[in-house]
Amino acid sequence: MASLFKKKTVDDIIKDQNKELKGQQRAITRDRTALEKQEKQLEMEIKKMAKAGNKDACKVLAKQLVQLRKQKTRTYAVSSKVTSMSTQTKVMSSQMKMAGAMSTTAKTMQAVNKKMDPQKTLQTMQNFQKENMKMEMTEEMINDTLDDIFDASEDEEESQDIVNQVLDEIGIEISGKMAKAPSAAKGLPSASASKSTGISDEEIERQLKALGVD
């Protein structure tokens, strides 16, 4: 019962109007079909009276045919008018829906604009840019430090390899010379023996410099 007293919305009114226009269009089409049948019947009657030589009957039937055809022509005009009204109703409905959508969008945009402070938004973007730059600088410093550590480690390894190589060469040379030297008592060798069999500090330093080790 509540639905009977419910106030119709604009959409409901438009739907009812479209329904009514469609009903009128169907009625016009039925009337035109009936007029076309009558038109054919009159044409047949006129031909029949003409064959019978009844001129008066032919004139009367011819007048009826003219009136009927005029009436049929009017049905086309009315049908065109109904179609135009239906089209206008559809356009009006589309415009109303568009207006409703625009109204909803405008309200949403208005609510968003109220919550968004341009000054705060600008400040937030500036803070983000500042912090992003800090992060990039920190990352760059960390990368540079790691590169220095790895480079220093590689240099140290290369230097150690060179020193080991020199010591190995010196050790081999010393072993060779020590093998040829006469064995002494368990005491220290004499100065002349050390000079003839050992390698001096100058010799070691010269070989280190030759290998690029300061």
Curated annotation (Swiss-Prot):
Its main location: cytoplasm. Residues 178-214 are annotated as: Disordered. GO terms for biological process: endosome transport via multivesicular body sorting pathway; late endosome to vacuole transport; protein transport. Keywords: Coiled coil, Cytoplasm, Endosome, Membrane, Protein transport, Transport. GO terms for cellular component: cytosol; ESCRT III complex; late endosome membrane; multivesicular body. InterPro entries: Snf7_fam. It is found in: Cytoplasm, Cytosol; Late endosome membrane. It is a peripheral membrane protein. Probable core component of the endosomal sorting required for transport complex III (ESCRT-III). ESCRT-III components are thought to multimerize to form a flat lattice on the perimeter membrane of the endosome. Belongs to the SNF7 family. Probable core component of the endosomal sorting required for transport complex III (ESCRT-III) which is involved in multivesicular bodies (MVBs) formation and sorting of endosomal cargo proteins into MVBs. MVBs contain intraluminal vesicles (ILVs) that are generated by invagination and scission from the limiting membrane of the endosome and mostly are delivered to lysosomes enabling degradation of membrane proteins, such as stimulated growth factor receptors, lysosomal enzymes and lipids. This is Charged multivesicular body protein 2b-A. It comes from Xenopus laevis. The lineage of its organism: Eukaryota, Metazoa, Chordata, Craniata, Vertebrata.
